[in-house]
Amino acid sequence: MSHSPARRPRPFVPAGWLVASIAVLLGGPAASAQGTMSLTTNTQLPAVGSQWNLTLSGAPGATFFLKASTAPSEFETAFGTVFIDPTVMFEVARGTLDPTGDFSVSFPIPNDPTLVGHVFYFQAASKAGAVKDSSNALAIRIGAGAPEGARHPSAIAATADGARVYVAHQEDGTVTILDPATSAIVRELPVSPIPTNIERELDVAVDPDGRHAFVVNPALPQMTVIHVATEAIAAQVPVPLSCRAVAFKFDLNGNRVFVASEKDQAVLVFTESPHGTFTQSATLPLRGLGPAKLALLPDGHLLVGLHNTLEMEVIDPDDLDGDPFVTSIPLGSRALDLALLGSRVFVPTFTPSTVIGPDGVNEVLEFDSTTWTLVDRHFGNLGTDYFAAAVSDANLVVCGTASGSVIVTEPTAFSFTSVVDMIPEESPKGLPSAVALVPPAGGGTPDRAWVVDRVRETIRAIVLTGGPPFTLEAEIPLAHSGAPRHPLLDLNTAERGGFLFDSVLFFNGSPTLPNPVSCATCHPANFSDSITSSRGFQAQPMFAVANTAPFAWQGGAPDLATFTSAAFARHGVVGGNLNKLAAADVTAFMASLTQAPTSPFKNSDGSLSDAAQRGELLFNGTAGCATCHAAPLFIPPSTDPPTLVNGVGTGLVPANVPTLLGIWATAPYLHDGSARTLLDMLDLNVTDEHGTTSGLDAGQKSDLVEFLKTL
């Protein structure tokens, strides 16, 4: 049956351009259609005031409907997968594909800067006779212009068949999808708003069936689900703020996705039913604090890396009614990653020194998960800041982020250990910060380690076949400029300082002779490391450090420049013009740190709960907290001496009063880490040397804690 040529396609300019509540997401050009239809665009980030074009290709003469939505929702049908949420969809165009099988429509985007960041999802459906078809899904985000600025790629995952690699960018809210067989970028897919909080880690993971990839961003109340086959955003699943890691358990009990929630101090369980729909079904409480890493053990238990209480905790995800706790494994340091090979668990970490002098040891701890005995310690200070690891039967690969190197070994007999300089052709080096082992197309033993460099904004493969010395393939630029970012030449002053903060460069370190520490060793991602050093003091967090002079626990540095110089001297960095320039850059970087991450304990509109409001009254009144921690920075008022003597059951010590901003994320507390929780901090104050809290009842203390968690 032919369609009347008089029925011309009718474009619609949707009123939704002006909807202020649209989720901020981004999409890229379509790589392939679900069936024979293909939906493409001239730009994934059209600017306000521009014309934006869509092209639909399919069967000549087919009747089609092009629809848009403000939310994705995966739903499988007989003729394809629909990603448009029918409750919020609207028609964009309809008609008949021309004899070439094409249809194009152009939208004028109003020149209204308030539209920047709004998102729309598009998908088309068609019918030619009895044959129905649906196109790929496409999302676009309205921007102010062409993408620019830093992206900071920081997480990586790969499908088990080696067909796709996913790289999540921390700063511009996108995921780059690559074909590792051709080293080609397939798509730039948006998953979160701009800007995101670059001080929190993202995570990306692919489920065991290879059907979906999941992205969590601690700064967002959503988990993005990517449909692997069509490379479309399948869903945005509501989660609390401050979710930090993803793991899976697909078995006879169903398909479950586990998410580490720092807000809940728990593991959240999401069940898939029906296909593509993920709904929270349970909450697994944790005894430890700061869940940041997850891994499924061979016995079906879940391993959780806890960054605040410096331990690992094993829980039973099938125990939904009782206490899921199985055991805990003290580490005394943070589990920077979890890499599993059967019952063997490899945990990269930094173990602080217990004596005055050396700072500590970068090492990979090996545990037997059947007994949780420590089997061995590997790679002592062969690199600096082992922020990521991956393991297969053939290779264990560990990123020495700060030293610009990657360690490769054979994980059974450790018959060789090779330190790979990731940028042998240039100096200074980059920051290799994430790694995935990827098999050849079709699956099998991984033959390449794909390494993401956070500062150069590149991905590069180490060819693992043949043994050492290992071959490096060419860098693939991920930066908006299309070229690797040189750590010194292509960054502004604060960005250079951020690189130096994370690097051993000015600590006279190199890939083959690293210094044991960088600034980021004790202040990773601007957080406290929760480690009490041999000097009896915890490393302070860098939240809002620009506005919280004086600095250091003793308050001896009146400004950031003095503080930086003292830190350099503490680590043996003295003299020379290069180090003077480095100190100035690091100072500029710290001066850019003016805020703490948004608290996940506030209401969605930023308001306080009733309990937190009661706690605020106590904070500013009866408890006397505001005497030393005055808003808005929660440090002593300018009329008071910056360094006060405070004893909280730990002996009187001269302690610079720290800001309380971000205190919800920096357990344990007090200068020596003796208070495990905020409530413990209040309970230790039996002589009221740290506010007047000894007379508060349990309910009042709970209210005060609820307020502190909102800062």
Regions found by a protein language model. Give the residues of each.
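Bacterial N-terminal signal peptides
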Residues: A15-G28
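Residue-level hotspots within well-ordered secondary structure
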Residues: Q34-A146
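N-terminal secretory signal peptides that target proteins for export/translocation
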Residues: M1-F12
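Bacterial Sec-dependent N-terminal signal peptides
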Residues: G27-G35
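Extracytoplasmic/periplasmic beta-strand context in beta-sandwich domains
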Residues: N136-L138, A235, A282, T327, ...
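Periplasmic c-type cytochrome electron-transfer domains
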Residues: A150, L297, R334-L341, F350-P352, ...
